[in-house]
Amino acid sequence: MKPGSDDFLPPPECPVFEPSWAEFRDPLGYIAKIRPIAEKSGICKIRPPADWQPPFAVEVDNFRFTPRIQRLNELEAQTRVKLNYLDQIAKFWEIQGSSLKIPNVERKILDLYSLNKIVMEEGGYEAICKDRRWARVAQRLNYPSGKNIGSLLRSHYERIIYPYEIFQSGANLVQCNTDPFDSEERDKEYKPHSIPLRQSVQPSKFSCYSRRGKRLQPEPEPTEEDIEKNPELKKLQIYGAGPKMIGLGLKAKEKTLRKKDSKQPDKEEVTCPATIVVKGEASEFGKVTSAFSDKNLNHSFEPCMKMTMQLRNNHSSTQFMNSYVCRICSRGDEVDKFLLCDGCSDNYHIFCLLPPLSEVPKGVWRCPKCILAECKSPPEAFGFEQATQEYTLQSFGEMADSFKADYFNMPVHMVPTEVVEKEFWRLVSSIEEDVTVEYGADIHSKEFGSGFPVNNSKWDLSPEEKEYAACGWNLNVMPVLDQSVLCHINADISGMKVPWLYVGMVFSAFCWHIEDHWSYSINYLHWGEPKTWYGVPSLAAEHLEDVMKRLTPELFDSQPDLLHQLVTLMNPNTLMSHGVPVVRTNQCAGEFVITFPRAYHSGFNQGYNFAEAVNFCTADWLPVGRQCIEHYRRLRRYCVFSHEELICKMAAFPEKLDLNLAVAVHKEMFIMVQEERRLRKTLLEKGITEAEREAFELLPDDERQCIKCKTTCFLSALACYDCPDSLVCLSHINDLCKCSRNRQYLRYRYTLDELPAMLQKLKIRAESFDNWANKVQAALEVEDGRKRSFEELRALESEARDRRFPNSELLQRLKKCLTEAEACISQVLGLISNSEDRLQTPQITLTELQLLLKQMGTLPCTMHQIDEVKDVLQQVESYQIETREALTSLPYSLEILQSLMEKGQQLRVEVPEAHQLEELLEQAQWLDQVKQALAPSGQRHSLVIMKKLLVMGTKVASSPSVNKARAELQELLTIAECWEEKAHFCLKASQKHSPATLEVIIREAENIPVYLPNIQSLKEALTKAQAWIADVNEIQNGDHYPCLDDLEGLVAVGRDLPVELEELRQLENQVLTAHSWKEKASKTFLKKNSCYTLLEVLCPCADAGSVSTKRSRWIEKEMGLYKYDTELLGLSAQDLRDPGSVIMAFKEGEEKEKEGILHLRHINSAKPSPMSSSMNASATSICICGQVCAGVESLQCDLCHDWFHGQCVTVPHLLSSVRASHTSSQLLAWWEWDTKFLCPLCMRSRRPRLETILSLLVGLQRLSVRLPEGEALQCLTERAIGWQGRARQALASEDVTALLKQLEKSRQQLQDELRHKKPPTLPSGFAFDCLTENSGKDILKEEEELVLNEERIKSSEKIVPKESSCKGDKELLPSLLSQLTGPVLELPEATRAPLEELMMEGDLLEVTLDENYSIWQLLQAGQNPNLERIHTLLELEKPENPGNWSEEQTPERRRQRRQKVVLSRKGEDFTQKELESKRVKSSRIKPKEEKFQKPILGDNVLYTHHTEHTNILKEHINSVQGKDPSPSSSFPSLTPLLHLSYFHQQKL
C-alpha cells in the first residue's frame, strides 16, 4: 500500500440527532421537526435510543447473493476520463498494429491526458514549439525544473499524442518516422481497459417495479458467434486483462513496394510485440508487471510501430489491375510507390499522404478513412458487471475481512476510519493501481428477506419481534405510514416501497446520485463496520451537476443523464474547491442516515457490513416531486411511477388523508388541474377534437410513456389512429407523428368537469382546517372586540387534536395562549388557596404580582380569577404599612416580628420590607438561643451544639449585640476544647495517669457550662478505677486465696481502664505464675494433642459406667464440641471457690467411678471374643474406628474389658520389661512379658510418677492463687498414696509373700534348666544383642533430687528404643510359645479377689506406681498364658503388618474421621446400641508418638519404669522378714499440705 500523494481533507460533519423516546415514537413527525436544520446539509444521522435494538431477521444460512464488481479507479469521473483518453490513443495505435507504451518520467507514469490538456490550454503543439514553452508545460505538470524535462515531454508528445491529435483534427493521418528518445525508464505498454465490455449492466430479474430497472435497457451480450464474426470483438477477447499472449499462431505477410517484375518473397512469420500492462489485477494492488523484456524488440523498426505487413497476392485479372489507382490523386502510375490499406484494400501513393512518406512503412497499415471509422465509433454505456461467484454472508465476510486485513496489514478492527478514507480517495484517483472490490448492492428484501422483523414472515414472531415489526422506524413500515405519500401506491416498488439490502466490504462504494423522484431515503446499518457518507444539500444540486459537467465534459456529452446511473464519483475536495458544500459522516451499526429530497449523496464502506435502505415521501415532498417530473421530462428519463396518478388517487379519497397531506394534495391538485386545462386548450387550438376515455392505471407503464420525454402519462395523452404504438404527452403534441391532425385524438382519464369535483372534495377536507383557523384567528386577535373565555379556547384546541389538524403556527399560538392562561391560573390558585400545598409553593414578589394582574388583563381570554388577584394586592399593600411601623419602633419585640413574618408567609407575596424583617427576626432568635445555652441553671449543651450555634451566628446579620454574643461564645468554646483535649490525652495516652491527677482535671472542668464528652468519659473511668481497687482489696483480704478466674477478670478490667493502678502489676504477676504452673502440669499429665483438659484428667471419671454418656462425651471432646470443666465434680463456679466442697466432691467422684467401671465391665464381659466364630450381632464390640471387631487382630482392654482393633490402638511390646542385667531365662518367664493393654478411653493421660507430681505440688505451695486443677491434683495425690499403702499392705501379707517367693523360685528353676541344657538355637543378634543395644536408652539413672523429675521425663522421651531394633526377639518369640507353661502359681480365690480389686483401682488412677505392676505380675502368673493375646501382639509387631497405624494418620484422614463422627451424630440420640455401632477413634491420640513416651508415661502399659520388678519382689519378701513389716502405716490420711511434707522426708 502506497501513501497518497495528495492528502484528503475530510469535509465537515453533518448534523447528528439523538431523539428522546417520546420523539422517537413518531418517525415522520420527528423527521419533519429536524428538517429545517438537516435539510441545509442534505443528509443527517440519527442515533436511536440506546435500548432500541431490533433483532436481525435475515435467514443467514439461506441468504445467497451475487455481488457487483467495482474497479475503483474507473468510478471517479476525472480518472475515468483519463482512462477513456488512454483507451482511445491505445485503440488508435492498435489499429495501426502498434501497442501503446506509456513512458515514465521522474519515476512516475506520464499523465498523457494532463499533458495533452495543458498543451491545448497553452495554444497547441506548434505554438509551444514556436515559443519554446515546454519547460512551462513541465512546471504545470509539477515536474522539477532544471532537468530538461520539457524536451523529454516534447519528444513523448510528438511520438505518442501528436499523431492522434492530427487525426482528430480531420486531416489525413500519417505516422511519424522519428527516432526513439531515451528516457529514464522503459515505456510502459498500455493495456486498453475496454470498460464498456467488462462493465456491462445487468438489469434486474425481479418481476416488479424497479426504480433503476429502466435506466439502461438490457443489451444482449456478444455471443461466441458474434465474436468470431467481429474482428474487433475477437481481438478484445484475445487480449483481455493481463499481459498479451505470444504464440497465438498469428501469421502475416510482409508488405513491400509493388513492382511488376519483382518476385514474391516467401512468407515470413513475425511475432507480436511484447506488451506491458499498466494496471494489474486487484490482488496485485496496482503493481505493474512486464510480460516480456525489451531485449526481444527489433530496433530496426519504428519504435511505435512494431508490426508486420502483408503483400497483396498477384492477380492476373484485368479488373484487378484497373483497381491499382491512388484514392487521392486517382492515378495509377508509379506503382512502386503504392501503399495498400489492410482494412479496405485501397491504394495510396506514399507521397500523396499528409505528411508524405519517404518509404513504405513495414507492418500493418490502415488508411485515414479506416482509422476514422474505427476511432469514431460511439462509446458504450459504463456500468458494473456482476461477479461470477455466489456468496453467503459468511463466505463474503471471510473474503472481505481477509482482503482488508491483507491490504492494511493489520486486524480489520484496528484500521482507523481516517486511514481507509484517505486510501479510498487515493485509489479512485490512481491510474496505475487497479484495485477491484465486490459490493452486494440493491439486493431485493422481498426475495431475500428483510433485516427487520416483518409480520408476514414464515415463522411466528416473539412479542419483542412483533413490537419491532410494527415500529415506524422499521424500513418495511415507514414508507406505508399514514403520513407517507407512498402508502397510496399499490405496487411494491422495489427500492422505494420495498427495502433494498446492501452487503459491503472495504472500498465498495455508491456513487453520487439523488433518489428517484427526488424522494427521501433512509438507510439503517444493521451490523458491521461503519459506512462513510458524503452529502450535498438540494440547493447546491445543480451547482454539483454543473461542476462535474465542467470538469468532465467528455462523459456528459455522450451521457447527459450520467449522474442518474450511480456509476460516477468525484472527490469531495474537488467539489468543495469549486464551491460545492459537502458534508460527511460515519454511520455506525445501529444508526440511521437520512437523505433529503434532491440531496446528492455518495460514500463507501469501511469494511464488512450489512445495511438496508428504502425511500419515503411526506407531504412536503409533493412540490419537489412535481419539479422532478419536469426535470425528468427535460432529460427524457423514465419515471418509476406517475406523479399525476398518485395525486389523483389521493384526491379520490380525501377523508383518508392526513390533514397536512390533504392540504398539500389540494395545492398540487389545483396546479395540476390548471396546467391540464391549459394543455387541453392548446390541443383544441391545434384542431384536435377527437377524444376517448382511457384507464391509464390499467396499462403497463411502457405502453403509456411519451415517446419524446419518456414521461408516464395518466391524465391525458395524444395518440394517432394510424400509429397505434405511439403516444405523447400534451407537452410534445408536435412530436407524435407526421400524420394529419384529423387522425390524432385525445386519450384522457378524467374530464375537465370531473377534475374540479375532485378538487372540491379536497377543498372541503382542507377547509375544515381553514374554518377552524378562522375561529382561532378571530379569538386570538379579538377581532370582534369580545374576548372568548378560557373554556372556549380550550375547546378549539381539543377540536384540532381530535380532527388531527396540522401542527401549524396558528395552533402553536393557541397552545401558547392556553399555556400562559394556565400559568396565570396556577399562580392565582397558589395565592388564594387555603390548602397546605399553598404554603409549599414559592412566593412571588410584589412586582410579579402586579405583572400577573397586567398579564391577565392582556390575554385574549377572560378569567374570573382576576378579581381575587386584586384583593390579594390590596392585602399586600396593607401588610407593607404594618411592617414599616414595626421596623421603626425600638426595642424590637420578638413576638411582633414573628407575627408579621407569619402573616407575610400567609400572603405568599414577598414585599421589599420582608428581607429586613427577616434579618431582625433571625438576630432576635439567635440571641435568645445563646442566652438559653449559657444559662447557669439550664441543661448543658454539647460542643457540637455550641459550634452549630456559633456557625449560625456567623450567618446572622451583624449588630453590636450579635457581635458581643458571638465573641463570648467563641471564647467559651476555646476553653472547652482545651479541656477536652486534655481529657482526650489522658484517655488515649500510652502513659496512664494516677487517680489523683484525674480528679484534679475533672474538678477544674466542672466549672465550664458545656457538656464535655471526654471529661465525662474520664470521670466514668475514674469511678470504675475506684470500684476496681475496692474489689481488689476485698478479694485479697478474704479467708482464702483468690481464684484464678477472679484474678483474670480483674486484670482484664484493669488493663482496659485509662488509669494507672499500682495493684494491677501485682495481679498480673500472680496470674502469670498460676498459668505457668498450670502449663507445667498440663505438659506433665496431658498427652500431645490430647482431647482432655487438665482438670478432666485429674478428676475421677464420673461417667465411667455409662457406655452412652462416656462415649458421647469422649466423641464430643474429640471434635472439640464439649467442654465441662465446671461440671466435672458437679459443682457450680461459686462452689469451686470452696476447698472443702472440692474435696468432698472428689471423694464422691471416686465412688461413682468405681461403681461405673464395674458396671461397664459387666456389660463388656458379656460380649464374645471377636476371634470366635459364634458372634451375636446384638452384642458385638465396636472399635473406635466405627467398625465391628471381627476377623482381625483385636485386643481386650484390661480395665473396661471392651474390644478394639490392634491396628487402631497403641499396643504393648512383649519384651519391654526384659532388661539386659537378666539372663535369657526371662524370655521363658512369660508372666513378666508386657501384655497389659488399656484402651484410649480408660487411660486418659501420661500417668506420671509420684516424684514428678511432688515437684508440681511444691510449686503449687508457692502460689497465692487458688486453682481448681491444683486442688484436684492434691486430691489425686492423696488418692494415689492411699492406694499405694493398701497395695503394699496386700503385697506384704503372708500369702502373697509366699506366692512371690514361689514365683522367684520358678524363675530360678528356669535359669538352672538353661545351665544344664543346651540353650535353644537363637538367631544371630537375638535378645541379648537387642537388649545390649538398647540398654543405655531404656535404663534411666536414679535421680534423688525431686526438682529434676521433669527433665528426666523429657530425656526419657528422647531415648525410647525403636521397635525395629529387636528383630531377634521377634523372630525368637514365636518359637517359644509352645514352651510356655502355666499357671506358674496357684492363687486362691481369697487372695485373687483382693488383688484384682486393687488392680482395678490402680488402673483407674492417672498415676504410675510400681505396686501396680507387681500385682499385675502375680495375677498373670496365677493363670494360663494368654496365648491368643501374645499371638495377636506378635502379629501386630511384624514389620509387614500395618499395625503401626500412626504412620497412616494423616491430617486429611483425621478430618474425615471427625466428619464421619459428626455426620453419624446428626439427629441421633447416643443410646448404647447406636454408640457402640458408631464408635470412632480419637484423632488426637498419636500412637506412634505415645509409643516413644511409653517407657516412662505408660500410655497402654501401666508400668515401664526403670526399677527392676525382681527387686520390688525382693523388697516385699524382706518386708515379710521384718525389715518393713507395715508399709501402710507410713501413709496415714493426710491433708494436701501434710502430703507435701511427707514427700520431703520419704524416698519412694
UniProtKB/Swiss-Prot annotation:
PANTHER family per UniProt: LYSINE-SPECIFIC DEMETHYLASE, LYSINE-SPECIFIC DEMETHYLASE 5D
Domain annotation ARID: ranges: 79-169
Zinc finger (C5HC2): 706-758
Catalyzed chemical reaction(s): N(6),N(6),N(6)-trimethyl-L-lysyl(4)-[histone H3] + 3 2-oxoglutarate + 3 O2 = L-lysyl(4)-[histone H3] + 3 formaldehyde + 3 succinate + 3 CO2
Domain notes: The JmjC domain is required for enzymatic activity.
Organismal lineage: Eukaryota, Metazoa, Chordata, Craniata, Vertebrata
Gene3D superfamilies with a match to the protein in the record: ARID DNA-binding domain, Cupin, Zinc/RING finger domain, C3HC4 (zinc finger)
GO molecular function annotations of the record: DNA binding; histone H3K4 demethylase activity; histone H3K4me/H3K4me2/H3K4me3 demethylase activity; nuclear androgen receptor binding; zinc ion binding
Keywords associated with the record: Chromatin regulator, Dioxygenase, Iron, Isopeptide bond, Metal-binding, Nucleus, Oxidoreductase, Phosphoprotein, Repeat, Transcription, Transcription regulation, Ubl conjugation, Zinc, Zinc-finger
Subcellular location: Nucleus
Residues in the signal sequence: none
Protein name: Lysine-specific demethylase 5D
Domain annotation JmjN: ranges: 14-55
GO cellular component, as recorded: fibrillar center
